[in-house]
Swiss-Prot record:
Domain CBM21: 525-632
Protein name: Glycogen-binding subunit 76A
Modified residues (Phosphoserine): 547, 549
One GO cellular component term: protein phosphatase type 1 complex
InterPro entries membership: CBM21_dom (IPR005036), CBM21_dom_sf (IPR038175), PP1_regulatory_subunit_3 (IPR050782)
Species of the source: Drosophila melanogaster (Fruit fly)
Any Pfam family: CBM_21
Region (Disordered): 1-20, 53-94, 232-251, 285-391, 405-435
This protein's record includes keyword ATP-binding: no
Molecular functions (GO terms): glycogen binding; protein phosphatase 1 binding
């Protein structure tokens, strides 16, 4: 099935002057025999390629018949049957944007009937069939990639790219005819402008001989310069044997790495096919090369890295490892120039001139500069090798310097006794010298082992000097007498100053009850009434603070104690909750505490209170058997030395006159006055 604009296989639109691209012309070059089955597979692949090219030419314009690629000029050179032309052809391989691809014949053909033979046909027909008639050359390499993942399983066999290269070694150095040396072209439309063409135009026979001569001339010049530079560096190496020994361990590793780079340069120079383009085609290529996409440039670099290592130059094999290390910078530049010459097809003569001039400039530099270039980032040497080389040299130099210093110190130490005069020291001279004061200790310091020779120790006993060996002192049990002279410097105050206890209060609170906790039957009272005041006293005479404690029966875990007090004879009252004392339970009773403030009382007033105990929904009272617990506010007593001023009657001081005794009893009596409320409880 053909779409409108597709080119049929049985006739041609325009005559083609090129030789027909037939299977007969390809097989002798590769050294294979024809087979009908492989030919049919080849025809299917060719039909797929023609379908792809037909769709591209339809986009550019169907009326341009001269631009349509014609592969087989006549119907006699095709193997496509009538039913094959009506079948739907799938895409064998998508269009690639690689501008730098190459023939890769380094695969081993297992046998003449191996599936690899068909793969070779597929690769060659991709090169021949995907190039338009008027395409412009752009690269010096031919396409060598396999069918893409988009191709059908029936279009071509599977090819194992990791096969060995024993059988294809014979076909490696063969060159295709000029009519078959074409490359697959990828044409893309960019915003309605002219398309990008990646590929190689067919070689023109007029320039083929010139290309070979230029390549031979370029290789001869490079080898000659490399040989001269190697000889000069060998002489320099012989004059500096010590420097070579210092870095010999590192240079051997670098030589092995750089040898591979030199061989890659040689293989690239020997086996890379190049094409000379016509002047008008070179100009068209220059315009299109500037419009290459980043993807094309990345694929170009990957294609250059895939160039296999070919047969190295004989001159390179004859070089010594040290020469290859020294000339690494030159080889890197030569490889760069050769790669640029392969990608760019402007002029081989100009590229050769630039390569030779660069080589001569490199050879004129000193060996130290060449060595620095080897370790520079531009030379391609890994940063790890650079740092390792610097570290090796630094360590070796440091070891040499340390050895020299050790030798110098050893000589100085051995020669010091001979140059100086030996001085004999005696014990007498040691005694004349001022001895250093040392801290006496009966313990060994542990710094020197016992038996180590040192200073002589001189021991003198007291009896030798006429002194007593022992000094006896007697201690008596009696209290020693202190002489008066020991107190002469002491100042004894005859009169003590009065104590300053703060401001004095003009009133005081006097309890009118006896403390229940001091009574012998206190616990019996607690057992009887379930609650009882234990004690209550004034703790602060300035603020008139009363602190007290209450003991209650342990009837239940939940219990509460309140103090009900009044300052105006029970005309009004207030309740104060007492606080439980932690860990006060003895199994029989618990203790609660409270604090009352009577600073608002005036002289002659009373503070009365009673205790209420609540437990299990019941209330228990302690009101001092109906008399309540009272504190009387009295004026404070002031005594003078002359006694001219009589203090008011006070219960605390007992200075109560006989005439006022009856009235005082009535004042202190809990039953006197209208303030008592007997029906309160």
């Amino acid at each position: 099935m053909n779409d409108p604009g597709d080119i049929p296989l049985t006739h041609t639109s325009t005559p083609d002057s090129r030789p027909p691209c037939s299977i007969i012309s390809i097989i002798p070059t590769i050294g294979m025999s024809s087979c009908r089955g492989r030919a049919e597979a080849f025809a299917r692949s060719l039909s797929s390629k023609l379908r792809t090219l037909g769709s591209q030419t339809t986009e550019e314009g169907e009326g341009n018949a001269e631009d349509e690629p014609i592969i087989n000029g006549t119907s006699t050179n095709t193997w496509v049957n009538s039913h094959d032309s009506e079948q739907t052809v799938t895409d064998l391989q998508p269009l690639r944007h690689e501008s730098d691809s190459f023939f890769d014949f380094d695969c081993e053909l297992e046998s003449p009937g191996s599936p690899v033979d068909e793969c070779e046909y597929l690769r060659l027909i991709e090169t021949a069939s995907n190039t338009p008639h008027n395409s412009t050359a752009e690269s010096g390499y031919a396409c060598a990639s396999m069918a893409s993942s988009h191709s059908s399983s029936n279009d071509g066999p599977y090819f194992d790219a990791s096969a060995s290269t024993s059988t294809a070694a014979a076909a490696q150095d063969q060159t295709l005819p000029a009519s078959e040396h074409k490359e697959y072209v990828n044409t893309l439309q960019l915003n309605g402008k002219h398309g990008l063409a990646n590929g190689v135009q067919e070689e023109q026979p007029a320039f083929q001989d010139d290309v070979q001569e230029d390549e031979a001339f370029l290789q001869a010049q490079i080898l000659n310069e490399l040989q001269k530079h190697s000889n000069s560096l060998t002489e320099v190496e012989q004059t500096k044997p010590e420097e070579g020994k210092l870095t010999n361990g590192h240079l051997e590793k670098v030589e092995e790495l750089e040898l591979k780079d030199v061989l890659e340069v040689a293989g690239t120079t020997n086996r890379a096919p190049k094409v000379i383009a016509a002047p008008q085609e070179v100009e068209a290529f220059a315009d299109r090369s500037q419009e290459q996409s980043p993807n094309d440039r990345v694929q170009k670099e990957s294609s250059q890295e895939r160039v296999p290592e070919g047969t190295p130059f004989e001159g390179v094999q004859g070089e010594s490892p040290s020469d290859r290390v020294q000339t690494d910078a030159s080889d890197e530049r030569v490889q760069e120039e050769i790669s640029n010459d392969t990608v760019q097809v402007e002029s081989n003569h100009k590229s050769a001139t630039e390569s030779i001039s660069t080589e001569v400039t490199t050879l004129e530099r000193s060996p130290e500069e060449s060595r620095n270039d080897e370790l520079s980032p531009d030379s391609g040497v890994d940063e790890t090798d650079k740092s390792a080389s610097n570290l090796t040299v630094d360590v070796d130099l440091a070891q040499i310097e340390q050895a020299k210093q050790d030798a110098t110190e050893a000589v100085e130490k051995s020669g010091a006794p001979s140059r100086g005069t030996t001085v004999d020291t005696t014990d007498d001279e040691d005694d004349c010298r001022p001895q250093r004061i040392r801290r006496c200790s009966s313990l060994k310091t542990g710094k020197t082992p016992p038996g180590t020779p040192g200073r002589k120790k001189i021991v003198r006993f007291a009896d030798v000097l006429g002194l007593d060996l022992a000094d006896v002192k007697t201690f008596l049990d009696e209290i020693p007498t202190i002489p008066k002279s020991a107190f002469e410097d002491l100042e004894i105050l005859e009169s003590e100053p009065p104590l300053q206890l703060g401001p004095k209060s003009d009133k005081l609170l006097m309890p009118l009850f006896q403390q229940p906790g001091g009574l012998p039957k206190f616990l019996d009272a607690v057992r009887e009434k379930q609650v009882s005041l234990e004690n209550a006293a004034v703790t602060d005479n300035i603020n008139q603070t009363i602190s007290g404690s209450v003991r209650v029966r342990n009837l239940d875990f939940h219990k509460s104690v309140h103090i009900r007090y009044s300052l105006d004879g029970w005309r009004s009252y207030a309740d104060l909750q007492a606080n439980y004392v932690e860990n006060s339970c003895d199994g029989f009773s618990d203790i609660f505490t409270f604090v009352l403030f009577g600073n608002s009382l005036h002289v002659g007033q009373r503070l009365e209170f009673a205790v209420r105990f609540q437990c299990k929904g019941q209330q228990f009272w302690d009101n001092n058997y109906g008399a309540n617990y009272c504190f009387q506010c009295l004026p404070s007593s002031t005594h003078t030395a002359g006694g001219s001023t009589a203090s008011p009657p006070s219960v605390a001081t007992g200075a109560v006159s006989t005439g006022h005794s009856a009235s005082l009893v009535g004042l202190l009596s809990p039953t006197a006055g209208d303030a008592w409320c007997s029906s309160f409880y």
